[in-house]
């Protein structure tokens, strides 16, 4: 039987993405958007107990809808988040985020990391698809030059 997962502090908002951890059984990430209710708060959650409890890991991402979250396939502490204004990366499991690359202002609808090539691939609404070498995540100069 299906069981509804409802727990504080998670609001009743549209769930934009659920991503299971590749590293830890029971860990799952969820993004939500309140766009349909004129709510532009940032909603990024992490559960380490199969969804019984949730922790807010939205940290310092600017206000606006969040559409997707993914774990890095090589480094368990790196998270990638696609928002209505671009891509953010956390290198500390969601405690802090920074803008990833020098993308044009774009709604990032989806984000994947190619496991063999270690390339970040994003799909935008109205700006096409973009690719970045995930190995460049720790090099700010390369991040600014390598989206193509």
Q: Can you describe what each PLM-predicted range is?
A:
Residues 1-147:
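Beta-propeller blade termini and top-face loops
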